[in-house]
Structure formats: C-alpha cells, structure tokens
A protein has these predicted regions:
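Ankyrin-repeat boundary/"N-cap" motif
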Residues: 227-237, 262-270, 296-303, 329-336, ...
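Leucine-rich solenoid repeat scaffolds
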Residues: 452, 458-485
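Conserved ankyrin/ankyrin-like repeat signature
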Residues: 247-248, 281-282, 314-315, 347-348, ...
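Thr-biased low-complexity repeat/linker tracts and other Thr-enriched repetitive architectures
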Residues: 313, 330, 346, 356, ...
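Ankyrin repeat domain, specifically the short helix-to-loop turn at the C-terminus of the second helix
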Residues: 251-259, 284-292, 317-325, 350-358, ...
Length: 485
C-alpha cells in the first residue's frame, strides 16, 4: 500500500485485483512472506503468545530470538544473540502479526488481532499449502517450547550470577514463576527431559538459583525471594516430588538414592510433599524405596496424617498394615482420625476405626474428633464416630463439648444426632455457657428450638452473656428471642 500513491493506474488496478478474498488468505500470504531462515523463530513466538500465563513485554518475548533450540543436550540461552532493537527484530520475524502497546511504562507485545490465533489453531490452516500449514498451533507443543525457554534461562544462572546480572536476563522472572506449570502441561516431553536433569542435578547450582528467585516452598503471604540468595543445599528430590515430576523423581532415586529422606522447609520430606500435593505415583515410588514415614517435621505432620487428610485411602491402608501408629498426632491438627473426619473422608474414617483409632483422643486445636466433625459439619463422619462408642460430652477445643460446637456453628442435623444419643443439653463450657446460650448468642433459631424440645434449662445464666434471651437480644437476633420456651 505504501507504493500505490506513486504507482500508475494500471498497477493500482492489478494490485487491487490480486488482494486476498478472505482473512485466511491474507494471513496465509503474510506467512509465506516470512523468510525461510526465520520461520522457526516465528513459530516459537506464536507458541509463546499462545500459552503465556500473562502478557509479555517486548524484551521478554524477544528471548525467543536468543534461544538456541538445536544446541547440544538442551536448548541454550545465548546472551550474545540478544538484540539492542527487539521491536525491529520481532517485526522482522512476525511481520504484521504483532503489535506493541505502552502499559505503565513497559512496551507490551501482543498479536495484532484475536483472529490471528484463531486462524493458527484452526483446522482450516491444514488445508493450505505446506509452508502455511506448518504454522498450525497445538497447545502441548506450545507448552514444551516455552518450558524449554524457561529452563534455558534458569540454566544460565550459577553461583556467580549477581542480582544485577539476573535482571538483565529476558523473561527470567516469568521463567522462575511459570516453568513448572508449562513443564507439567507439556507432560515432561522428551525435549524437556535433558534440561530437567541439568536443573535437578545436585552437583549444579541452577536449582538453587531458581529457588532464590521464586521459592515455591513458602507459605501463603511469605515473600518468594529467599533470604539467602545461594541456597546450594537445596534438595533436588524434595523439589521434584513437590513439583510432581515423576520421571525426575525416578531418575534421582536411581542416581542419588541418599536423597530419599532429605528435608525441605515447608513439607518436611519428599514423601510428605508428594502426598500433600496429590502426586500419588511419586508417593508410591518413594514408599517402595522405603521412605521414612516417622519423620515429624514441617507443618503437616507425618505421612499418615497427610494421607488421611488428603483422602489417599490406599496409602493410609498401606501405612497402617505395615505398622504405623494409627493415633500418631501433631500438636496443631491432631491425629489421622481428626483430619480425616474434619475433611469428611468417610472411607478413610472407616478404615482408621477398623484399625482401632481412638475416637476420644484429644489433640490439636479443636479437641476430640467429634468436635472437629461438628465444627466442619460432616454428618456422615459424626454418625460413624457415634457408632464407635464416642463420648458425646467430651470437653476440649475452643467451644467445649460437641453440642456446644454444633450450637455455635448452627449444625442442625448434627445437633439432632447428638441430642438423640445422649448429649448433655446443660453442659457448661470453660466460660460457663450452655449450648442454649451459645446458639442464642449466635442467632441459630432452629438449634435453639431443638435444644428446648430436648429439655434444656432455659433459665440458666452466666456472668458474661446472662440469660439466653439477653444474649440473643443484645446481638439483635429477634427470631431467637421469640422462639417459644
């Protein structure tokens, strides 16, 4: 179009007559104009834009042009391939398919129109000539491409890479935050495996570099940047298990068997990391290599508690049959029965009861298992515990008895179950409240009705809230105040 104003009329007519008849033909013609030596770069740019988890800056996207995808062993980041003119280079390989916008001081790269990706992922493109059809986009290969790019820049890190040098590496923060996601989505393809083996090799510093930039082994709200930028003691097996990389765990177990019980910070052992993140194939692999199931580190407790909480029935059975303590407990969350009951895994609860789990043991912050069940509202688990000679009036935890807990949480059906099986309607909690006072104060009118029908003392008072009627009135629960006594 730039030359038309200076062209003869006959030339203008010829150009207009040769214009593509459809958008697909327009895109196909643009792709055919991409130089043959650049087509793979163009393909990788499309891959990156297809599956990137967030918009990329022009500099980040230009990383595609600095990756040697045919390097020996695994794709490699070539620093000398970086360009001082990233926008011009991207336009060279992608023509008019790309556009750039300024957002908060950053130059962001994007496809020029949503129809571009629709065309590239459609079946229609496969009906065009081979040099166009080769650009067909598929999701899994796209994740493989971006995973290779992420690994390439992470493998560029070593113990001598300072903070300033890191900031000069394109896409480094994106890579640190997202490579695990892309690698999982790429199903740890053959093309990714060599890079993973280098990253998780205990003799290399690359894994420590990633952990320094973005430590996934932190709790919510904690900074991802670690305090120590050179955690060279990072345990590869622990992180591989946490990430869910089955083949890599198998490789590390066969190559570095001493790492079996190495400790991380958040979960403790590789086995607990695998169980908590539901990587069951890895968990079985570690158990079959005789992983230690007695370790009490981290926040989550030993493997039996974690497996019970996550509902991993067969692993719970395996651990119990080989002799793990059915009543093992962690100071905050209690025993396997506490956690399985609290989450509502009825099959696990039944199994634990078959192995004579103590239904009245008090531990953790809630008291006995029945109190946990009541607070969480799992009627089925409450029924299983009731059938196992549970003490309906056990005291403990924040609320007092299970009936106090049910009254506080408004659990109508569980309240009915407790009342029908001997719960004391006039029991006192630590603060001297009865269940009726608790239900009144919290505004649970239906629970109040149930308690009154079962003969609770409606005249009872305590020094903090007074009578049930006063407690309800002060909180504005008029429906409770008017419940007939």
């Amino acid at each position: 179009m730039d030359i038309l104003p200076r062209s003869l009329p006959a030339t203008v007519v010829r150009v207009v007559e040769e214009l593509p008849e459809s958008l697909d033909q327009t895109y196909a013609r643009i792709l055919l104009r991409v130089a043959e030596e650049n087509w793979e770069h163009t393909y990788h740019v499309f891959h990156t834009l297809m599956v990137a988890t967030r918009p990329l800056t022009m500099e980040d996207l230009c990383l595609v042009l600095a990756i040697d995808f045919i390097a020996e062993v695994t794709p490699k980041y070539e620093e000398i391939w970086r360009s001082d003119e990233p926008e011009d280079n991207l336009i060279t390989v992608c023509s008019t398919f790309l556009s750039f916008i300024d957002v908060d001081g950053s130059r962001m790269a994007q496809l020029s129109h949503y129809s571009v990706m629709e065309f590239l992922t459609s079946q229609r493109i496969l009906r065009l000539e081979p040099k166009v059809a080769r650009y067909r986009m598929y999701e899994e290969p796209a994740h493989v491409t971006i995973a290779q790019m992420c690994l390439a820049v992470l493998l560029h890190l070593d113990e001598h890479t300072g903070k300033h040098a890191v900031e000069e590496i394109p896409m480094i923060h994106y890579a640190a935050e997202n490579w695990v996601y892309h690698t999982r989505f790429g199903n740890v393809a053959t093309e990714i495996r060599p890079g993973l083996e280098l990253l998780f090799n205990p003799k290399n510093p690359h894994l420590a570099g990633w952990v320094w930039l973005h430590d996934i082994d932190t709790f919510w709200g904690e900074p991802k940047i670690t305090a120590n930028p050179r955690r060279l003691d990072t345990a590869p097996l622990y992180y591989a298990a946490q990430c869910g990389f089955t083949d890599m765990v198998d490789h590390l177990l066969s190559t570095y068997p001493r790492q079996l019980n190495t400790l991380g910070s958040r979960y403790g052992t590789p086995l607990i990391a695998a169980l908590e993140n539901d990587h069951l194939e890895i968990a079985w692999m570690l158990l079959n290599h005789s992983a230690d199931t007695t370790v009490m580190t981290g926040f989550y407790g030993p493997p039996l508690i974690v497996a019970a909480k996550r509902g991993h029935l067969e692993i719970v059975r395996f651990l119990l049959e080989r002799g793990d303590d059915v009543n093992v407990w962690e100071s905050y969350i209690g025993t396997p029965l506490h956690v399985a009951s609290g989450v509502g895994h009825l099959d696990v609860v039944s199994l634990l009861l078959e192995f004579n789990a103590d239904v009245n043991i008090r531990g953790g912050c809630y008291g006995a298992p029945l109190q946990v069940v009541t607070i969480r509202g799992h009627l089925g688990a409450a029924q299983l515990l009731r059938e196992s000679s549970v003490d309906m009036n056990t005291q403990g935890g924040y609320h007092g008895t299970p009936l106090h807990a049910a009254s506080a949480e408004g659990r109508v059906e569980i309240t009915r179950l407790l009342l029908e099986h001997g719960a004391d309607t006039n029991a006192r909690a630590i603060n001297s409240e009865t269940p009726l006072q608790v239900a009144s104060r919290m505004g649970h009118a239906e629970v109040v009705r149930l308690l009154i029908r079962h003969g609770t003392d409606i005249s009872v008072e305590d020094s903090v809230f007074g009578s049930p009627e006063v407690a309800a009135s002060e909180r504005g629960h008029q429906d409770v105040v008017h419940v007939p006594g």
